[in-house]
C-alpha cells in the first residue's frame, strides 16, 4: 500500500510505494545472474549454472550491488503504481520530474519513496497594492533618429573615427580598476576591445565611456552589484582609470529617398514615411523595457511580502542546468574550470554558493509568474495572438500570413514568453489601472492596420 504525504518546507509531494513482492524476488535473481555473468572463476566455464559456481559467485558479489540492479529493474513499474496516488490537484501543482530514494530494502522487501517538486502553497499571496510606478512610454525624436541611423549603418564597413564614441560603437582602451585605493585582481587590461552597450561590464561602466574619443583619459566610478560573483567586490564602489586608444564607427549611408527605398519597407519611400513606419516598433520596444522594469521592481516587492518556499527538487535541477551552462561557456572560451577558479581566486564552495543563489533567483521569478497566472487565470487569447502576429509582421517587414506559416497558432498559444508578458500586464492592471490602460492601448496600436492615425499625434 502506497502512502502519500506533503513536505511543506521543501514543497514536495512524497509517495512511499512497496515493490511488489514477487517482482522483488525475481528482480534480485535477474540482477544476480547479470552480475555473475561477468565473473571468471578458475575451474568453471564462464556463467556456469552449477550450484557450486553460484555459491562462489555470491561470495564475490555484494548484496548492495544486487539490490542496486534489482531496484533499477523494478523502478518503472513501481513509479507507475506511485503515480496513481496523485490526484488531479497534485498533477496540476507538479513543477518538475520526480526523484526517488530507497526507503527500505532487505532480501524480502523493498520500498521506494518518490518525490515531486510542486508549486508551493502561499497563504494570502500578496501581489496587489505594491506601490510600484510604471515608466511612461513616449517616443522621442532622438529615439527615431537613432533607429534610422542604425538602419543606415546596417552592413556598413567599420572605420576608425576621431569623433566621440556612441552606443553600438567599438572602442579600444586601457583600464585599471581600484577598490579603496588599491588595484584589484582582474580589474585591469590593455588595448581591450569593447562594443559599447553590449553590457559586458558591470552596470554604469559602458555608459560612462560614451562621448569619449581617441586620446581621452577619464576616471569613472561604478558600484559592483550586491550579488556580484566575486564576493569580495560585491556592493563595493570602484574607480576605473580609462585611456582611449581608438574608436570605430560604421560608415553610415547618407539618408535620402534612394537609401530609404533600399530598406525595402512596404509603402516607405521618403524620410517622413520612414519615421511614421518605425514609430510603432520603437514604441513597442520602449513598452517592453518599461514592463520589464516594472516587473523587476514588482517581483522584488512580492518576494519581500511573501514567504515563498523553494521546491528542493526544482532547485537541484536548476543548479545542475546552471553548472552545465557554466562549464559550456568556459569550454567555448578555451578555459578549464580549474583555470577559471585560479584566475578568479574562487573555491568550488564559493561557485556552488553563487550557483545556488542564481538558481533561487530564477525559481523565485518562475514561481511568482505561476502564482499570479493561477490567481488571475491568465491565458493567451485569440486577440492577443492576432496582435502578436501583427507586431512581428511589422518588426520583420513580413506579411502576417507568412509569419503564420513559420509560427503556427498552436505554438504561440504555448509560448511561455508571451504568456509571461500577459502575466506582467495583469500585474500592472491590478496595481495601476490607469498605467495598464495606457500600456494596453499602446499594445493594440502595434497593429499596422490600426496604428497610423494615432502615431501622428505622439512625441
Swiss-Prot record:
Protein location: Cytoplasm
Signal peptide boundaries: none
Organism superkingdom: Bacteria
GO CC term, one of those recorded: cytoplasm
Matches recorded under PROSITE patterns: FKBP_PPIASE
One matching Pfam family: Trigger_C
Major subcellular location class: cytoplasm
Reaction catalysis annotation: [protein]-peptidylproline (omega=180) = [protein]-peptidylproline (omega=0)
InterPro entries cross-referenced by the UniProt entry: PPIase_dom_sf, PPIase_FKBP_dom, Trig_fac, Trigger_fac_C, Trigger_fac_C_sf, Trigger_fac_ribosome-bd_bac, Trigger_fac_ribosome-bd_sf, Trigger_fact/SurA_dom_sf
Keyword list, A-Z: Cell cycle, Cell division, Chaperone, Cytoplasm, Isomerase, Rotamase
GO molecular function: peptidyl-prolyl cis-trans isomerase activity
Alphabetized Gene3D superfamilies for the sequence: 3.10.50.40, Trigger factor ribosome-binding domain, Trigger factor, C-terminal domain
Enzyme Commission number, as recorded: 5.2.1.8
GO biological process, one term: protein folding
Residue ranges, annotated region (Disordered): 439-459
Domain PPIase FKBP-type: from-to ranges: 168-253
Physiological role: Involved in protein export. Acts as a chaperone by maintaining the newly synthesized protein in an open conformation. Functions as a peptidyl-prolyl cis-trans isomerase.
Domain remark text: Consists of 3 domains; the N-terminus binds the ribosome, the middle domain has PPIase activity, while the C-terminus has intrinsic chaperone activity on its own.
HAMAP family (alphabetical): Trigger_factor_Tig
Name of the protein in its database record: Trigger factor
